[in-house]
């Protein structure tokens, strides 16, 4: 897809020749670090932007190797769609299971399993169907709302942008067409108003000495001037006066818009506070259960130890009481304790 919309092809062709390839290694479009290009693997998260006449895209190319799993979590944390690459010759591996599980854990609403390198299995429908059955069985134990399978060959471009003439048995859309038609607007929660305050705006000028605005990104729900809101954790209630952006005032704001909200009353609000509806407020708790993806290889998560915990823009200290169970990523079975 980037091949069709990137101006970096000449550089990629040159590096491919330097590495002795007889073909253009398109993975170099997203492998930006020198170490990545030298080793032929993805290490860091590479963000690339492109657009078609129908939609704008941001690709977060994340590493597949186990030692760089934390970078994969970073890239997937804000994604609307997860593309899980599966080698047609190998089927589901520990790596692909790990990626599918993490995408599910992070709540990515759409998952597309791209069965790649179909050219190396003679475009076999039976190979594709076998992998689809294996992945579908695994996905039944995940929280995946929308699961799609596409057979393709990234090297030759089959089913990437154009339909493949080598796989007439596949009646689905090619990858780019599927992404263009994917409906993501309904994935946003427009009911439960949650506006975490990121920054308090207090201009230091005589003309605006009484101005106080609260900047942040709308996490969920819809905000409008005149709406009643409650400030947590303090519990004060007030009314939204205006909603502002750099382009002017708004009549409403919804996810993932970044805005400045002003209130009719002067209330002590700081970074980390949250605006919500009085009748639909989140619970304020001292104790919670959480599913954690632990990344620190040098130290284990230890019950009784104090850690920093970050929720939107608020940071606090927390003590781990106990570990109820661990999850085997390959089988998804729970290991107690």
Please annotate each region the language model reported.
Residues 1, 12, 40, 61, ...:
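Residue-level signature of catalytic and energy-coupling elements of molecular machines
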Residues 109, 121-187:
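Canonical P-loop GTPase G-domain recognition
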Residues 52-55, 203-337:
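C-terminal effector/interaction modules appended to NTPase cores
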Residues 1-67, 79:
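P-loop NTPase switch module centered on the Walker A-proximal segment
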């Amino acid at each position: 897809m980037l091949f069709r919309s990137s101006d970096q092809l000449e550089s990629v062709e040159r590096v491919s020749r330097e590495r002795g390839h007889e073909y253009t290694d398109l993975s170099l479009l997203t492998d930006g670090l020198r170490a990545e290009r030298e080793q032929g693997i993805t290490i860091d998260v590479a963000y690339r932007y492109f657009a078609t006449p129908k939609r704008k895209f941001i690709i977060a190319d994340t590493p597949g190797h186990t030692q760089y799993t934390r970078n994969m979590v970073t890239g997937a944390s804000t994604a609307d769609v997860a593309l899980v690459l599966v080698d047609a010759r190998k089927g589901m591996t520990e790596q692909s299971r790990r990626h599918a599980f993490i995408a599910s854990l992070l709540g990515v609403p759409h998952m597309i399993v791209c069965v790649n390198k179909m050219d190396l299995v003679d475009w076999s429908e039976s190979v594709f169907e076998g992998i689809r059955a294996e992945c579908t069985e695994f996905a039944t134990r995940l929280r995946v709302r929308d699961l799609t399978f596409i057979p393709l060959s990234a090297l030759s471009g089959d089913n990437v942008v154009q339909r493949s003439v080598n796989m007439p048995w596949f009646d689905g859309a090619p990858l780019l067409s599927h992404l263009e038609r994917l409906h993501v607007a309904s994935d946003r929660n427009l009911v439960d108003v949650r506006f975490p305050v990121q920054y308090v705006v207090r201009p230091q000028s005589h003309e605006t000495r009484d101005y106080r605005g609260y900047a942040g990104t709308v996490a969920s729900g819809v905000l409008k001037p005149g709406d009643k809101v409650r400030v947590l954790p303090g519990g004060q209630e007030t009314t939204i006066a205006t909603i502002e952006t750099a382009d002017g005032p708004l009549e409403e704001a919804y996810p993932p818009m970044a805005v400045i909200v002003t209130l009719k009353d002067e209330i002590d609000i700081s970074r980390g506070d949250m605006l919500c509806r009085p009748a639909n407020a989140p619970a304020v708790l001292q104790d919670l259960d959480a599913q954690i993806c632990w990344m620190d290889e040098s130290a284990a998560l230890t019950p009784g130890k104090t850690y920093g915990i970050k929720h939107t823009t608020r940071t606090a200290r927390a003590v781990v009481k106990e570990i109820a169970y661990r999850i085997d990523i390959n089988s998804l079975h729970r290991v107690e304790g």
